Structure formats: C-alpha cells, structure tokens
Amino acid sequence: MSFLGCLRLCVASLCCMLSLGIAAPAHAETSEVRAAQQFGLSYLALMMMEDSKLVEKQAKTMGLGDIKVSWAKLGGPGAMNDALLSGGIDFGTGGVPSLITLWSKTHGTPQEVRGVGALNSMPVNLVTSNPNVKSIRDFTDKDKIAVTTVKVSTQALLLQMAAAKEFGEQNYAKLDPLTVSLPHPDAMTALLSGGGTITAHFSSPPFQYQEVGRPGIRTILSNYEILGGPATFNVVWSTAKFRDANPKTYAAFVAAFEEATATINRDKRAAAEVYKRMSGTKETVEELLKMMEDPLVEYTLTPKSIMKTAEFMAKVGTIKEKPSSWKDLFFPNVHGLQGS
C-alpha cells in the first residue's frame, strides 16, 4: 500500500474512534490514596481498613488494579484540616465540629468538604482529678482542661455548649481560657501524673476508661448529656474535588469503610485484638472488649445529632454558613441512612 493509502487508512480509523468516543483512554484515577486518623478506639474502623488492606482489596474489585494507600496519625483537627485543604491528604478524620467548620469554609467551592460517613456514636466524658470540682461551675483559674485543640475540637465545642447551658448563651466561651491543646495520650499522662497543671481532660475511649479506673479520677459530664442522647463522635471526610476526579476510588474507600464497620460489629473480640496490636496499648483484649461492648458505644456510618452542634455553632458565630440539613454536610452515599 502506498504512503497516501496508509495515511487515508489512519485518518479513517481515527474518525471511527472519534465517532465511538474512544479517541483517548479514559481519565486515569489516582494511584495513591492518602488518609489520616487520630488516636483512640473511635478510629478502629480505619485501623481495620489499614490492617486488612481493605481499600486496596475493594479497589481491585472495582477494576482499579493495585493502588497504594498511605495512613498518617495526626494529633488534632488543626493539623488534619491543614493537610486536607493543602492537598496533603485525601481523607481526613476528626470530630463533628471540624467537619462543620470545614464545610462552612468551603461550601460552594470545588474544594467543598463533606462527610463520607460517621465512624461511631460514643460517650465522650469530661473527667477530673480535682476533688473540689463536682460540675463545670466549680472550675477556677487554677484548673487546666485538656482538649485536643482549643476552641475547635469536639471536646472544646462540647465544653462551650455545656457552658452556654450552665452560664447563659452569651457566656459560652467562659471556660475557654482554662483549656489547653494536648493529644489524648499526652493529656491522660499529664492528668494521671498528678504533678502538672492538668486537672481535667475532656477525653475519649479508651482513655476515659483508663482514667476513671485510677483513684481520685471521676466523670462529671458527657457529650450524651450535653446533646440529649447518642451522638456521633468522629467522622471521615473528603473533598468534592477528590470525589469528582476519582469516583471509583472514592467508592472503593466507602466500600472498605462499610466492610470494616460490619467486621467490627460481627466480631468485636477480633477487632479488639487488632486495636491492641496496632496501638500498642497496655489494656488487655478483655478490657478493650468491655469498652466496645458498652451499650452506649456503636460503630456505625449513620450521623447522629449532627445538626444540634451545627445550630449551636451558627448561633454563636463560629460558622458563617449554616447547613439546612445534616445531608448538606455529607456526600450522597449516606443520605439513605436515618441520620440527624
């Protein structure tokens, strides 16, 4: 065949490909997923995902081939939020106030942050070593209350909500000057040492169980009291930009998340063994299992009591943009659940 004939054949083939919509390979999704978590039993589903390589498994099932999944441990919402918005991670985790704050800041932009699902509903307790403190009204300027991040963490917001109830809405920040930022493991160490300035810790499982097991440490308040019932403690979130660019990868992460949560609920003992091995905690598997079987603890993707926190944050001016429903704060994959 002449050169001209070959050229005509190539042009004809190209036109055929264009007409079939296959002129170029489909947009390739990311080959790496970067996720971050914090410390404690509330992040168990993510630890299960990491340990069993569930995201990698689901990605293969969805035809994405081999992908790399990186996991980071961050100590509070400040670092988590910065990492997500700077593009350093694809999936972030933390408390409900952090999700609401991120959503309010990014709503309507390509970087809009929304929840992928709740990690759990768990009691989050304020514990103290000060024998004179029977309620938050008894704290003085000699007390220091450890929270993961002052003003913005779940515990910091819960303390504000409690203060608003106790001292009046205009005094919601009355206890803020007493708070200090510490990751939960460090806060527990400081509280139990008895030699420092930390006299209270707005804690989380398993740390709060360890703390009240020591003489002189007791619980004076919980998130369930403040919010009027079971409430989501931690959430997984991502950006619309990542989800839109990587729909199959996002779906693989969700499937892995659902699988991990189902596995925990099916065999809590095995899940407790994973937590002990991965965290290096001193608790026995039996002690961890007892915490996980607390009837107030639930591993579920269903968001609960989200709007109560959002309404408070809007009322006191912490956020400028208020969601009209909990569904505004989450991607559609959980919209079919009975959230609140």
What is the predicted role of each segment?
Residues 22-28:
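Sec/Tat signal peptide C-region and signal peptidase I cleavage site
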Residues 29-172, 177-181, 195, 199-205, ...:
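Short, glycine-/small- and polar/acidic-enriched structural segments
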Residues 8-21:
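Bacterial N-terminal signal peptides
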Residues 244-320:
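Secondary-structure end/capping motifs
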Residues 74-78, 93, 149-157, 185, ...:
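Soluble non-cytosolic domains of exported or imported proteins
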Residues 176, 185-276:
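Pocket-lining segment of extracytoplasmic ligand-binding domains
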Residues 313-340:
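Conserved C-terminal helix/tail region of periplasmic/extracytoplasmic solute-binding proteins
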